Amino acid sequence: MKFCAIFVLFIVLAINGYDCKIVQFIFGDSLSDVGNNKNLPRSLATANLPFYGIDFGNGLPNGRFTNGRTVSDIIGDKIGLPRPVAFLDPSMNEDVILENGVNYASGGGGILNETGGYFIQRFSLWKQIELFQGTQDVVVAKIGKKEADKFFQDARYVVALGSNDFINNYLMPVYSDSWKYNDQTFVDYLMETLESQLKVLHSLGARKLMVFGLGPMGCIPLQRALSLDGNCQNKASNLAKRFNKAATTMLLDLETKLPNASYRFGEAYDLVNDVITNPKKYGFDNSDSPCCSFYRIRPALTCIPASTLCKDRSKYVFWDEYHPTDKANELVANILIKRFDFMRADDGISHAPSPAPDISPSSDNN
């Protein structure tokens, strides 16, 4: 799971008459999506129907893949930051970017372009980076290159994805990656790709960046439902551990090589695993099945109006087959706030801007 420290104290800077804040730019998947896929007309990975959003605002679906808030929402709120707006939100413009930052996260997206292809439309990380480059062009036109460079270099960046590259790619025989690689070579492939992506983000100004690790993927309700005995699938969870270990090493290496880079890895595996293993310790009654399900039909994959809801959503760790409930997200957010020393605006680093490189091409339907 993926999320922490996308949050900073506000420092107001006078930029050509604008009050430019230090903001967040979030890159991720459905755990961080706040409405991008809602605006992708052909996407099969959406949270557009009830009962998604039932405990958020007016109770209507808003694009978040949960009943309430994401972890990013909760941490940002507690630190006092505005929520970054979804890139595809109709309200998006230059002023919104300068005031709130942007969330590019997309349900079904992965580090690899090929991940989640059967969802038809989703933003891979490469695509999200391309969109970010477009955001930069818009801001440069608004406030000028010098001030735009400072704005983007002062911003905070979060990269929180990777589980789809396993669950909706490598672990599915319909994808060629499942038979082209073994466990270690696939993780190596992911690390090579992610390293290239982080280097691109650095060249685009990302100096303060956090990558979040994966949780025990084999213990989400979907993976349990697909197992023979209803227990966690160790293969998937062990892949998450491999990913986390490799990402930690890669980030430490990158930080020493890239000028003025402050890169951190947010490890959450042990925390989430403990919540799932010992739910009552954290106030939950159920950690192995979704609150929103289609009667006894499992896996239901998504929550729909015909689904049935559990009696008390606050007692369930999982909202649907993939995603945590608002209550679980709140627990994780609170523990992460205590665990990590968040990157703040007042520890800024001065640096010279780097030229933007060519972006690796993304597939047409990303």
From Swiss-Prot:
UniProt entry tagged with the keyword Hydrolase? yes
**Residue positions the entry lists as glycosylated:** N113, N260
Record-listed E.C. numbers? 3.1.1.-
Per the UniProt entry, the signal peptide is: 1-20
CDD domains referenced in this protein's UniProt entry, alphabetically:
SGNH_plant_lipase_like (cd01837)
List, alphabetically, the Pfam families matched.
Answer: Lipase_GDSL
Tell me the Gene Ontology biological-process terms attached to this UniProt entry: lipid catabolic process
Active site feature: S30, D320, H323
Subcellular location field: Secreted
- Keyword terms: Glycoprotein, Hydrolase, Lipid degradation, Lipid metabolism, Secreted, Signal
> Gene Ontology cellular component?
extracellular region
InterPro entries from the xrefs? GDSL (IPR001087), GDSL_Est/Lipase (IPR051058), SGNH_hydro_sf (IPR036514), SGNH_plant_lipase-like (IPR035669)
The broad enzyme category this protein falls into is hydrolase
Alphabetically, the GO molecular function entries are: hydrolase activity, acting on ester bonds
| Family under the similarity heading | Belongs to the 'GDSL' lipolytic enzyme family.
Q: What is this protein called?
A: GDSL esterase/lipase At1g74460
Annotated source species:
Arabidopsis thaliana
